[in-house]
Amino acid sequence: MVLSKVACFITFSSLAAAGTLYSANFASDFGPFSTCNVKAPSSATVESGELKFFFDETNFDGTRDDKGVEICVFESGTRTNVKQMAKEGWQGFNIYVPSDTFPTDKHTIFSQQFCPGGCSSWCGTLEIAGNSVVAEHRAACGDPTSATIVQSISRNVWHKVVVRMKVSQSGAGAYEVWWDGSLVYSKKNIDVGFGDWSSDTLSSGWYFKNGQYAYGMCLCKVSAGLEDH
């Protein structure tokens, strides 16, 4: 693992997560989202309708909170994530990746679907790998199904992203991604998700996260953001 300083800008806009619908246009604040898994000087800031993420890896301490900066929806008065869905959910946002402050040779997750239950808990992710976008999903604590869904990201422009995940342990699940209005990945009639099941529904729930999870460390600066269009 190479440790360094990472400053990246990714920009998101019109962020919505449903089950229960949570959305924000970032006109003045994060609401109803909160920053999570972040340690200063890394930060998320709202500027002119954009949510900008800045990740600085200097003096990395090995903790999860020092691997990026993300946003979550918490239960009132707690730091516990709201379990937004039990079966099917949709996650939509716009993302902007700049050419001057985001690297082309690193790995950064920017969209996550979490199924609380150990082993890092994620059951689906979208990540920037080099200059490609990779989708991953899994039905247990093990190796995921992985596919490159965008070969080369066009930088300095906004991209519209929609993720649909339907959990199942009986072959009735789905994982789909739309990029700029086109369906670029679709897997149906699959197993996806894990946790406590009841009639093929996750009684333990699942939820979304957005931001930067720079699990692949680098010697660079990276920045990112979200905006309402």
Label every PLM stretch briefly.
Residues 2-4, 17-159, 165-229:
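Low-complexity, Ser/Thr/Pro/Gly-rich disordered linker/stalk regions
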Residues 5-15:
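Sec-dependent N-terminal signal peptides
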